Amino acid sequence: MAFILSIGTSLPVYDVNQEKAAEFARYMFQHSFKDIDRLLSAFKNGQIHSRQFVKPIEWYKEEHSFEEKNQIYIEETLKHSREAVRECLSHPDFFQEAIPYEKVEAVFFVSSTGLSTPSIEARLMNELPFSPYTKRIPIWGLGCAGGASGLARAAEYCKAYPEAFVLVIAAELCSLTFQPEDKTKSNLIGTSLFGDGVAAALLCGEKADRRVSKLKLAPKIIDSQSVLMKQSEDVMGWDFTDQGFKVIFSRDIPTLVEKWLKTNVQIFLDKHQLSFRDISVFLAHPGGKKVIDAYIKSLGLSSEKLSSAQSILRKHGNMSSATILYVVKDHLQNGNKKEAERGLIGALGPGFSSELLLFSWEKGA
């Protein structure tokens, strides 16, 4: 059992609305598709209003080497991770006083949009006053499922060490993977969806001292479930080229969600003798409008139970693994909470895979 006590976030400064993003896509792809106007409707109909990027949109019109893009990834990810962690450990909405860095026993660092060895959390520990004995657990390659998986693995750590405080950092700079020479439909659709963002969550075990928490009710993680769909590597992921990360993005993802997810959720709920009616809220990774629609149709949920996911999609688009932490933060600050009510945290990612967490609202301090 583990509690989510706080979430901090950090966004790049370059805010791009969908109209401007569609103009960019037209410039980049107009000579590659005869039906470009139809394809560009994805920008208008995707329920995304704006996204944030680490570079001005004009920068992405030119080719950049993988070396250049990855160096930017390291620098910007470190900067935004630092800001997200600082906010997470001292957010006035969540704490009466800041949590000392040396209290953090382990750091899970999650990403899939760049490479760094030593990994980013090691660089972060050189810039912030963490204990040198802090355990480092980098997780790479889970894509959009990574944030939920990071929460699940951190909760398992807290179960083993119930007095521990643990950080989960999810950092994704999706825009740096854009390849202007890639004129595929997958790249165009990806251009309509993905944005950049970093988030950090603080979890603690049941026996940790939570007296500084301001939360009247906090999510207490009860259990998690990981599921892999076999022989589905081609649904989403990366091809690695001389230019960097080339997106793999199947158009069948919403259909797969609709057909595959319900059974997995049902098995998870059955394990705890629960039904869909017992779930008050679904804090889901909003992969896109069609994915949210598939959640609603497949699980028979009301749109209201996915309101935080829809809100984050509108404001920031799909930030891969970081997105789910933004969704949880939105609900912590703005959502309805009632003691002992249960909810789900969920995300889907490369594999093709599903990560689910069951939680209940319990007294935070």
Model feature map: region roles:
Residues 1-75, 180-259, 263, 348, ...:
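Condensing-enzyme catalytic core mediating Claisen C-C bond formation in acyl metabolism
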Residues 6-8, 110, 140, 165-172, ...:
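Short beta-strand segments
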Residues 15-16, 118-122, 149-152, 177-182, ...:
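Short acidic, glycine/serine/threonine-rich loops at helix termini
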Residues 46-62, 66-130, 136-137, 141, ...:
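Conserved beta-ketoacyl condensing-enzyme motif
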Residues 76-94, 120, 198, 256-271, ...:
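Short, well-ordered amphipathic alpha-helical segments that serve as non-catalytic structural scaffolds
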Residues 112-114, 131-133, 138-159, 258, ...:
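Claisen-condensing/thiolase-fold acyl-transfer catalytic domains that form or cleave C-C bonds
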Residues 115-130, 169-180, 233-238, 292-306:
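Acidic-glycine-rich active-site phosphate/pyrophosphate-binding loop
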Residues 139, 149-153, 170-196:
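Active-site glycine-rich loop that binds ribose-phosphate moieties when present
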